[in-house]
Structures are given as C-alpha cells and as structure tokens.
Amino acid sequence: MLNHTKKIKEIYEDIQRRLYYMIPEKWDKLYLYSSVLDEPDKEGKTGELFFYYIPKGIFKKKPVNVYEIPLKFNLDEIQYLKLVEILYQKIKELRKEFKKSDEKEIWTNITLSIQNLRFKVEYDYTDLNNTEFSSYERHVIWRYEYLGISETQVSKDEKEILRRYMSGAKTIARKEHYDTGIYIQDIENMVAYSTENYDDNNEEVEEIPDKIEKKHKNQILFSQEEMEKMKFNKK
C-alpha cells in the first residue's frame, strides 16, 4: 500500500484548490487524468494532463474539457494554459514524493475524481512505453471508462478504437486507490469572469456579430506564488 505522507497530502490539497480555481462555473463532478513517464514514449511524449468537469444543472450536462474553457468563457488562452502547466508540474512533484518512499515500482498515470466532497485517486502502473494504444487512443478509452461516453456518442474512428479495446486481450495492470474527504473552505475562483455573453442552456459561447465591437477577454488572476513560478520557469 502506498504511503501518503504529510507532504503528499499537502500537494493533493494544493491540486484541489487549483482545480476549483480553474473552473469558472458551478459543477457536480470532475475527473482528471495525468501521466508522467521517466522515458519518452513511442510518440516522444513524457506525459500529459487533461480533465473534464460536469456542470451543475437541472438537465444532464455534457462533460467540459479543460482545453475548451478559454473559448467557453472568453478567457485568454495563453494565460489559462499557464495554469494548466502549473497544475501538471504539481502532478510531477507528487510523483517525485512517491519515489522518495522507497517504492520499487512507481505509478505511470493517475486518475483523480472529485464528487460529493470526496477526493479519489486511482494509481495505474501500466507500462505506457509498451502499450498497443497511442496517447490519443488511451484518451478515447479513458473517456469511455470514466465519463461514460459510449460508442453511440463518438466518431467512426473512435468507435473502432473502442471496438479494438473491448475485443482485445486485457492486460491486468497493478492499480491502487486512495479516498479522502475534501475539507477546503472559502474557495475562490482564480478566474475573474463575466457571464454576460454566456447562456447556461447553450453549449457554445454566444457569437458576437462582427459589426459590434468585441469586449475584452475576461481576466485571469494569478497569485503571487504563480507569478514567482512563472518567472522561475523562464530562467
């Protein structure tokens, strides 16, 4: 069983805060996937991160991808992606802390979920450098398993990916789980946003006619900590 040290728990609390900060609307559920590899995979990647959240509402809402948020809420994409990068650095820091606990084998990817004030983590030890599925294909499979996006909701190519996955031999990889409560209070969004041009019943941002002057993008607020980290990364 993994040793969740005080430092690891502090990193998780920091990750939780960042996730709450980065979502500029009320939501019910959140699922995050991230991988961290010691060596580049077949595509030359050493890891990735994405998350989806389910907006709060009376009617069933579609999952929103983190990379859709800037367009959906008229945010500066470059600034927002800096927040995503900082979040990924926290995941890498988390993995380094687990390495310090004398683990002979370290996880390659994790799935975090937040729902009903519970914070759950699934640690997956699959060897991503020796898998038949590409990063994109694993993303499709992950959405199927965790978001419930079925074959009827995806493209023809994605259906083929799911067919291969479901009909192929399953490799049983080591997995471990962690479950704890969320006790963070007085959480504020890091994003100062306006909903003036946002319709909660519409999946798209309201289109502004060309003849009307477009308003400035909503401001993303960085804390002093974030500013210092970005300065450090530029060195």
Question: Where are these predicted regions, by residue range?
Answer:
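A broadly used, surface-exposed interaction patch
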Residues: P55-K96
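Short linear interaction motifs
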Residues: Y12-D14, E85-E103, N233
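Acidic, proline/glycine-rich low-complexity IDRs
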Residues: N116-K235
